[in-house]
Structures are given as C-alpha cells and as structure tokens.
C-alpha cells in the first residue's frame, strides 16, 4: 500500500493528528516534490519511537541542531517507503543493529515546524516537516554509537524520563507524552490479544 493510501486510512488519535493528517494529505496531493528537500516549504520526514521488548525504555539521541534529547528519524530524501527510512535512520543514528517494527502501521502523524538554521555551512530557511512516526522495537543490549554529524549522545530512558530529558517544551507536551500514551495503549491491546 502506498504512503498516500496509508495516511488516508490512518485513524487520528486526537485533534492534533486529525488536523495534521489533513495538511499532510493536502501537501502530498499538491506537491510532486514533497518527498525531497527540493520542496523548501514542506517535505516528508519520518520519526521512530523506539522502545525495548518490555516497553519500559525509550531510545533517544542528543540532537546537535536542536540541542536536546530527541526521537530518532530523518528526511525521506526521495524514498516513499517511510518504514524502511525509519529503520535505516535508527540504525545509522544509534548503532542499534536489532530493530524491527512493533507494527507496520503508522503510529502517529505530526506537522513539525523547523526554524531556520545552519547546516553544513549553509542556511536552511524555516519550513515544515510532514512527519510520519513508527513504533519500533530494538534490543536494548546492543551497543550504542553516536552519529557525530547529527547527534552527540544516544541513550535509553524510561518512557517518562525520555519526555523529561527533552528541553523542547512543545515536543514534550504535544508529541512525546502522546507517543507514550499510545505506546502504553498499544502494549495493553497486544497483551489482551496474547502477543
């Protein structure tokens, strides 16, 4: 199933996701280059809420640009298989080798504002990230390594500790708390199903 259909079929968790889903779909339909950074206004990105097998730890990286502990992920850069991008980004940004989807379904949707910043010596204007998030499960015994051009630390936190570690208030209140709520709900539903 293509990503447009996946997003069309996605059932929003709250008003934020409902409104952001509409904007993401509008952009997917309006722009041919939304999967690349050539679209300087808005482009597709992917994030991962990475948990361990017990769902009691969350993997975060200390993001160089945002100067904060943050979820893992990156730009689609022309790739429309966003789950594959999420898995690749987690491996690249953390060094974790054993990572898999908890589900192949989209876990969350967000439209994220990105302030103008310097990247590799060039100014990047403010823009939007049309973000798809996946819930991934990783082996928390794997060695962790930083990706110096993107982060300066990688660490496992308790779910609530991951929220507290972020210095980005908006992310804590609107994204990370939501992801923890959804993760706990996902775990309860799967326990009831005997998975």
Report the location of each language-model feature.
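Generic secondary-structure boundary/loop-capping signal
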Residues: 32, 41, 66, 141-143, ...
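Charged phosphate-binding loop/patch that engages nucleotide di/tri-phosphates or the phosphate backbone
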Residues: 167-195
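A short, polar/proline- and glycine-enriched secondary-structure boundary/capping micro-motif
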Residues: 68-74, 156-157
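Unchanged
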Residues: 77-170
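Acidic, metal-coordinating catalytic segment for phosphate/diphosphate chemistry
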Residues: 9-47
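N-terminal strand-loop-strand
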Residues: 36-71
């Amino acid at each position: 199933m293509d990503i447009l259909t996946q997003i069309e079929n996605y059932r929003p968790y709250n008003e934020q996701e409902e409104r952001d889903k509409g904007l993401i779909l509008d952009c997917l339909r309006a722009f041919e280059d939304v999967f690349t950074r050539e679209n300087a206004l808005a482009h597709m990105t992917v994030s991962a809420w990475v948990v361990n097998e017990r769902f009691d730890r969350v993997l975060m990286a200390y993001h160089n640009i945002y100067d904060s502990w943050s979820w893992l992920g990156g730009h689609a850069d022309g790739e429309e298989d966003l789950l594959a991008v999420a898995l690749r980004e987690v491996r690249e940004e953390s060094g974790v080798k054993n990572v898999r989807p908890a589900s192949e379904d989209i876990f969350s949707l967000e439209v994220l504002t990105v302030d103008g910043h310097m990247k590799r010596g060039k100014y990047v204007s403010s823009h939007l990230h049309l973000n798809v998030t996946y819930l991934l499960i990783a082996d928390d015994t794997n060695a962790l390594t930083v990706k110096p051009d993107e982060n300066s630390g990688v660490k496992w936190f308790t779910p609530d500790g991951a929220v507290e570690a972020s210095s980005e208030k908006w992310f804590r209140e609107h994204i990370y708390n939501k992801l923890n709520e959804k993760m706990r709900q996902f775990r309860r539903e799967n326990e009831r199903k005997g998975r």
